Curated annotation (Swiss-Prot):
F-box domain ranges (all copies): 2-50
Record-linked PANTHER family: F-BOX PROTEIN SKIP23 (PTHR47123:SF15)
Pfam (any one): Beta-prop_KIB1-4
Gene3D superfamilies listed in its UniProt record: 1.20.1280.50
Entry protein name: F-box protein At2g17036
Length: 404
């Protein structure tokens, strides 16, 4: 029988460099001491301060610093399911706090707000007891003293979605959405932000790193490739005809998709399917359309079937997964989209709720009304909360450890 502990160190080093997920690397290094010594921890590129964006009308921000948070969205399952309920995974976002060794903060998976986790949630997770799959990695700009700029509100420090491209171990590029929908690029070797002044007809709504390139889409559906070397924009897809109010770019199986959501305001519900958010006498419903990018034709082509996929639309990232990987087949199959119902431009809504759209039925519902989907997010499953010691006054911070 092969003694895996005796594999050549250079081969182990080569394998470890192919592991993009930090959690895969943790499990790799936990196999034995020789594997641990052969594969060092991943180097983080953002353990330093970044300047704030150029701002002529807000000079008080010139002394504000930014940092980049690394966040991972995980699907966690028990290694040995004991019952049918254990076949459901738990989807959670973790913020890897690089300033405190091996300490992480648990967040809501489609936003960056903390969840109020139960007191008996464990403070320490032994990752060797679970199957951990990283569904998505995202970066988020933040200000360490977000609420501590004298005389100014947190709203003035609102930071948009950010995506990253790594060039090598020492160089990286960030693309972010600024206030009023403009784009800005940060190149690590420049140590400064460059605002892109190329023509954008309407404000940018979403960003994505796809096929090694930065893509951005505006309110009308016009999609461009952002060149971080020349700071020029190249048309990738023409605007949609009669598009909706909110657009998300998402990669799935090597292709780029567009999810276009239309918000419908009515005095009385006019749709037989879906759910409605009420504000006084006004109701809000949602219409979804899905498109696939055909770049050679510079257009978005509407699709009628997503296959057996789940789309997740978050504040700081979008990602997809096979439905069969997320929920047991005994519960159901099909295509689903998880999204937050609140949108800044939709002033009639005063709270954020997680919704799910069923592609095949065309119906939308609140996740908390569907137990088979709600258990993916909240509360934490019993096999998490009962396998460790209770912790009082738990704030959402935890540590990870692996056995070696």
């Amino acid at each position: 029988m092969m003694d895996w502990a005796t594999l050549p160190k250079d081969l182990l080093d080569l394998i470890s460099k192919c592991l993009e997920s930090s959690f895969d690397l943790i499990q790799f290094r936990s196999v034995c001491s020789s594997w641990r010594s052969a594969a060092g921890p991943k180097r983080l590129l953002w353990a330093h301060n970044l300047p704030f964006f150029p701002s002529d009308d807000k000079p008080f921000l010139s002394n504000v610093i930014l940092r980049v948070a690394h966040q991972s969205i995980l699907l966690i399952k028990p290694n040995e399911p004991q019952c049918e309920a254990d076949l459901f995974g738990w989807i959670v976002k973790v913020w890897d706090n690089i300033y405190v060794s091996r300490k992480m903060t648990l967040l809501k998976p489609l936003s960056s707000s903390r969840n109020y986790f139960p007191q008996h949630l464990p403070r320490i997770f032994d990752m060797s007891k679970f199957t951990v799959r990283e569904l998505c990695r995202e970066v988020k700009l933040y200000h360490p003293d977000y609420y501590c700029v004298p005389g100014h509100t947190a709203l003035e420090l609102e930071l948009g979605k950010t995506v990253v491209k790594y060039l090598n171990d020492d160089k990286f590029v960030l693309l972010t959405i600024l206030e009023y929908g403009k784009l800005a690029v940060f190149r690590s070797w420049d140590r400064e932000w460059t605002v892109i002044n190329d023509y954008i007809p309407s404000r940018c709504q979403d960003l994505i790193m796809f096929d090694g390139r930065f893509f951005a889409i505006d309110y009308n559906g016009r999609t461009v490739v952002v060149d971080y070397s020349s700071f020029k924009l190249t048309l990738a897809a023409n605007p949609l005809i009669g598009g909706g109010d909110k657009k998300f770019l998402i990669e799935s199986c090597g292709e780029m998709f567009l999810v276009d959501i239309e918000f419908c305001l009515n005095e009385k519900p006019e749709f037989t399917g879906g759910f409605y958010s009420y504000f006084n006498e006004t109701t809000v419903s949602y219409k979804f359309k899905f498109f696939k990018l055909v770049e050679r034709e510079k257009r978005w082509v509407e699709v009628e079937d997503l296959g057996d996929k789940m789309f997740f639309l978050g504040d700081d990232s979008t990602f997809s997964a096979s439905t069969a990987d997320i929920i047991p087949r005994c519960v159901g199959t099909g295509s689903f989209v998880f999204f937050y119902t609140h949108e800044e431009s939709l002033v009639v809504m005063d709270d954020r709720n997680l919704g799910v759209f069923d592609f095949r039925s065309g119906k939308t519902e609140l996740v908390n009304k569907l137990p088979e989907y709600a258990k993916l997010f909240w509360p934490p499953p019993p096999w998490i909360t009962t396998s460790h010691e209770s912790v009082e006054n738990y704030t959402g911070e935890t540590s990870s450890q692996s056995q070696s």
